[in-house]
C-alpha cells in the first residue's frame, strides 16, 4: 500500500539511493558527497520534505529547503524525483499536495523552484500544479583555479583582495538583482568553505 510521509526517518544513504535512481537519466549527475553538499547549501529540511513509499521503498520524493526569500519564509524544491517505472502516475503531484498543510503549518508563505528550460516533462507537471515562470537564469560553471582571481589595486581608492564569507555583511543593499535561491547569501552562509570570496 502506498503511503506519503515526510523524509525525517529516512537515512542519507536511502535518500541518495532513491535520488540516484530517479535521476539516472538526468544530464547532471552527483556523487553522494556532492548530493549532501547540495542539500546542505539549499537548506534541506527532512521534516518538511515528503515522499511516496510502497513497502518501505521510496518511489517519488520532493526534498524541500527552507529559508527566507524576498523577505518571506519560503520552501524551495531542492529536488523532485520519481523512479522511472513510476513516472506518469501523478505521484509527484500527490507528494506535493500532501506536503502543503505541513508547509503552511510551519509558516511557509511561498514555494519556489527552478527547472531546466528543456525539461518539458517537469515544466508540464509544475504548470499543472499552478506554478508560473517568474524569471529565467543562465548558468555558468568554472573551477576556481581556472579563474583569474588575483588581488590587485583598481584605483587608488579600491583594492580587490581575498575575503572569507565571515567578512561579509548582508550585501543585499548593493544588489541590482536578487540572486537565485542556490546563490543567495543565506545559501553561501550555509557552506562558506565551498566558496572563494574576492571583494
Over which residues does each language-model region extend?
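A short, polar/charged loop-to-alpha-helix boundary motif
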Residues: 68-74
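Amide-forming acyltransferase catalytic core, primarily the GNAT-like/NAT-type
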Residues: 27, 32, 128-199
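Active-site rim helix/loop that mediates acceptor-substrate recognition in acyltransferases
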Residues: 12, 19, 27-55, 59-66, ...
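A short, internal acetyl-CoA/4′-phosphopantetheine-binding micro-motif in the GNAT/acyltransferase core
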Residues: 79-87
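Conserved GNAT acetyl-CoA-binding A-motif
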Residues: 103-114
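A conserved short alpha-helix in the GNAT/GCN5 acetyltransferase fold that borders
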Residues: 87, 96-104
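Conserved active-site alpha-helix within GNAT-family acetyltransferase domains
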Residues: 89, 93, 109, 117-135
